[in-house]
């Protein structure tokens, strides 16, 4: 089909292989691409400007919510653009170092418990 490709994900548990794949793809494509690693096995390739941050801001615009009024929760490198784009970036306790570096709040819990903690604290005020 004549449909544009927006995202490609490769999976390999070996970080050195993932770095090699990233380097080879970025060397061979003739357009701007963002590449991120996530979940200790994925290499994600998106067109520049196609990321969770842009999607979050677009949804906010659609709903009439300003970026500084948005809370985003993340845990991995592919969440960094989203975390950078919002007013309250939150990560769970087992988040990657780069995600944590872009957070204003690090939840004490992992995954679901961390998300519940953030919602209780910042949305419900408990």
Regions from the language model: what does each represent?
Residues 44-126:
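Mg2+-dependent phosphoryl-transfer enzymes with acidic/Ser/Thr/Gly-rich catalytic loops
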Residues 1-73:
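Conserved acidic, metal-coordinating active-site core of Asp-based
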């Amino acid at each position: 089909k004549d449909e544009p490709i927006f995202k490609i994900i490769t999976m390999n548990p070996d970080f050195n292989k993932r770095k090699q794949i990233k380097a080879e793809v970025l060397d061979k494509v003739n357009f701007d691409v963002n590449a991120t690693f996530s979940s200790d096995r994925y290499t994600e390739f998106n067109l520049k400007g196609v990321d969770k941050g842009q999607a979050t801001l677009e949804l906010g615009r659609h709903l009439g919510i300003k970026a500084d009024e948005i809370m985003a929760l993340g845990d991995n490198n592919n969440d960094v653009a989203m975390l950078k784009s919002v007013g309250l970036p939150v990560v769970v306790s087992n988040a990657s170092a780069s995600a944590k570096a872009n957070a204003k709040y690090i939840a004490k819990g992992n995954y679901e418990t961390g998300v519940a903690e953030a919602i209780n604290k910042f949305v419900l005020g408990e």
